[in-house]
């Protein structure tokens, strides 16, 4: 393809609303354009990258035995009402009514639709297992869409759904999809890690997230340096260590005027934060609950929500805090907490040690509080966020906390949807059984952005070869030089015959402009044809990833290019 015929509107500056590097570079490279908040148009170059990701995903899904379908984006409310998600999914589900006053939504996911499809077709165990997938546009009405393609409202996703006779069959389907995901992200040239994860609103008993490793990632991972354990910090277990502090003395009230936070109380009383207990108040499915963690710890709200089995968990408002405790925010504590009947504490707090807690009284705390003696704790559980100082819960080794971007998620759904929607079949004995489900998602458009978050430099995008819109940027420095133009056309034909996508820059622009644009769009292989080089019988080749330049002979170019390209691919681990 000739650049002069392409629509590639590159920009020198990023838009003011672009926060992360992928958003900035996708816009600057002319790959996406914003239509409205969280909704983007894929330009020709961006669509090429998107389609390349989708092609690899499709190949590996087919290889794993899944079959492609295409389901409607518009979904009727009655299916969501069957599973109860119409009420509980929240405002991210965009709902509307048609002219006949029937309720619908734009699908953020398709568990209900696929279950309805399969329950209407499958009658016998002989028809199972089934694994169906689609690559489709989804819509989630994010409250704060941001970061371009990273957290948009409209996005392209691959979602697959497996249906099996029993749990062992579901386990096999899960393994097959897990292996397919490993192949997909390896083929895309991404540095990634599969981690244990919380299943969230999708539900199910077990799941893994596939994370692209990037310093700009929104997620934090807990990764053991000594064994294979890896988990999202939301899921990561913390091994409780017994408290060795002295037993509590007599409880005593202490004034703490104006000290609302752990830091302020710690400074005012001259004690370390690990001698204090945070009392955090929530509303869980309409019911007030309290959660306690040590003052220097962070509560893991996902663990609390799972412990409660709650569909919703929201931090209490200042008005609710005052109504339940009789004190403003910052002075809540577990002793005499009459407005909250359910109180849970992290395992680290179990025992007779004396703690400093809020007194449920303005400007006042309590010293020497024993949770065993002085508070009514319903249960002790692992409620805190893991830190780098905690040991691995599997082997006791050291834990690192790298950042990651979620690009895939695989779930063992079990009977969550099939039971509520009565998706059944007859087994060998003619007995009705409920299908066991799994679901498997990949954010196709998010992969493009995540790839750029992981692979960029000060000059632009550094695409891995499998994702690059054009693998080869062939820069013809002087289009008016007939000899150079002829040689460029010859090289272009050879490369295309070899199966490479080539963008021949034949524009009437200064060489500096061509070099900058080639770096910006991220083609992994750059070839430069200049009059001086051709006079010496060479073509300059640049490895976009390393920046290393070399000269390839015009005579024998084919073999020289193949060898050079093999070296570039090796650097990518491909």
Curated annotation (Swiss-Prot):
Q: Which PROSITE patterns match?
A: AA_TRNA_LIGASE_II
Q: Name one Pfam family in it.
A: tRNA_edit
Primary role: Catalyzes the attachment of proline to tRNA(Pro) in a two-step reaction: proline is first activated by ATP to form Pro-AMP and then transferred to the acceptor end of tRNA(Pro). As ProRS can inadvertently accommodate and process non-cognate amino acids such as alanine and cysteine, to avoid such errors it has two additional distinct editing activities against alanine. One activity is designated as 'pretransfer' editing and involves the tRNA(Pro)-independent hydrolysis of activated Ala-AMP.
Q: What is known of its domains?
A: Consists of three domains: the N-terminal catalytic domain, the editing domain and the C-terminal anticodon-binding domain.
Q: What is its main location?
A: cytoplasm
Q: Which GO terms describe its biological process?
A: prolyl-tRNA aminoacylation
Q: Name one GO molecular function term.
A: proline-tRNA ligase activity
InterPro entries with a match to the protein in the record: aa-tRNA-synt_IIb, aa-tRNA-synth_II, aa-tRNA-synth_II/BPL/LPL, Anticodon-bd, Anticodon-bd_dom_sf, Pro-tRNA-ligase_IIa, Pro-tRNA-synth_IIa_bac-type, Pro-tRNA-Synthase_IIa_type1
List membrane-spanning regions: none
Q: Which Gene3D superfamilies does the annotation name? A: Anticodon-binding domain, Bira Bifunctional Protein, Domain 2, YbaK/aminoacyl-tRNA synthetase-associated domain
Q: Which PANTHER family match?
A: MITOCHONDRIAL RIBOSOME PROTEIN L39/PROLYL-TRNA LIGASE FAMILY MEMBER, PROLINE--TRNA LIGASE
UniProt keywords, alphabetically? Aminoacyl-tRNA synthetase, ATP-binding, Cytoplasm, Ligase, Nucleotide-binding, Protein biosynthesis
Name this polypeptide is given: Proline--tRNA ligase
């Amino acid at each position: 393809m000739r650049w002069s015929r392409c629509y590639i509107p590159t920009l020198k500056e990023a838009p003011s609303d672009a926060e992360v590097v992928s958003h900035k570079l996708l816009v600057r490279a002319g790959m996406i354009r914003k239509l409205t908040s969280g909704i983007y148009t894929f330009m020709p170059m961006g669509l090429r990258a998107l389609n390349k990701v989708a092609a690899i995903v499709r190949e590996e899904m087919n290889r794993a035995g899944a079959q492609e379908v295409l389901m409607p984006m518009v979904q009727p409310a009655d299916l969501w009402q069957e599973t109860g998600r119409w009420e509980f999914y929240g405002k991210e589900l965009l709902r509307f009514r048609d002219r006949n006053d029937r309720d619908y939504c734009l699908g953020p996911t398709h568990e209900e639709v696929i279950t309805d499809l399969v329950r209407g077709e499958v009658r016998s165990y002989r028809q199972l297992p089934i694994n169906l997938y689609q690559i489709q546009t989804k819509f989630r009405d994010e409250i704060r869409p941001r970061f371009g393609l990273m957290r948009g409202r409209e996005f392209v996703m691959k979602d697959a759904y497996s249906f099996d006779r029993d749990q062992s069959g579901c386990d096999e389907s899960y393994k097959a999809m897990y292996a397919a995901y490993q192949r997909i992200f390896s083929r895309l040239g991404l540095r990634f890690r599969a981690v244990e994860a919380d299943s969230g609103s999708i539900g199910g008993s077990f799941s893994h997230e596939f994370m692209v490793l990037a310093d700009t990632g929104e997620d934090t991972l807990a990764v053991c340096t000594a064994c294979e354990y890896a988990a999202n910090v939301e899921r990561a277990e913390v091994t409780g260590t017994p408290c060795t502090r002295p037993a509590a003395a007599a409880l005593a009230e202490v004034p703490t005027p104006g000290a609302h936070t752990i830091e302020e109380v710690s400074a005012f009383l001259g004690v370390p934060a690990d001698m204090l207990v945070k009392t955090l108040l929530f509303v869980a499915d309409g019911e007030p609950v309290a959660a306690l963690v040590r003052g220097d710890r962070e509560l893991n709200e996902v663990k609390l929500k799972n412990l409660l089995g709650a569909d919703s968990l929201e931090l209490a408002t200042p008005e609710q805090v005052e109504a339940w405790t009789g004190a403003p925010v910052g002075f809540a504590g577990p002793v005499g907490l009459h407005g909250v009947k359910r109180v849970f504490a992290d395992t680290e707090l179990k025992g007779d040690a004396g703690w400093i807690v809020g007194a449920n009284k303005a400007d006042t705390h309590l010293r020497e509080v024993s949770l065993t003696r002085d508070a009514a704790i319903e249960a002790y559980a692992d409620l805190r966020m893991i830190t780098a100082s905690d040991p691995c819960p599997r082997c006791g080794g050291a834990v690192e906390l790298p950042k990651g971007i979620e690009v895939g998620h695989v779930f063992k759904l079990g009977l969550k949807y099939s039971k509520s929607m009565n998706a059944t079949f007859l087994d060998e004995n003619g007995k009705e059984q409920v299908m066991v489900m799994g679901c498997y998602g990949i954010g196709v458009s998010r992969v493009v952005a995540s790839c750029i978050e992981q692979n960029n430099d000060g000059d632009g995008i550094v695409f891995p070869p499998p994702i690059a819109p054009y693998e080869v940027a062939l820069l013809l420095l002087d289009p008016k030089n007939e000899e150079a133009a002829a040689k460029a056309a010859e090289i272009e034909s050879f490369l295309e015959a070899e199966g490479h996508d080539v963008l021949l820059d034949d524009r009437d622009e200064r060489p500096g402009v061509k070099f900058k644009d080639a770096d910006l769009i991220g083609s992994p292989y750059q070839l430069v044809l200049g009059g001086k080089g051709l006079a010496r019988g060479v073509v300059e080749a640049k490895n976009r990833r390393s920046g290393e330049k070399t000269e390839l002979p015009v005579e024998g170019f084919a073999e020289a290019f193949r060898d050079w390209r093999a070296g570039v691919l090796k650097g990518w681990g491909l």
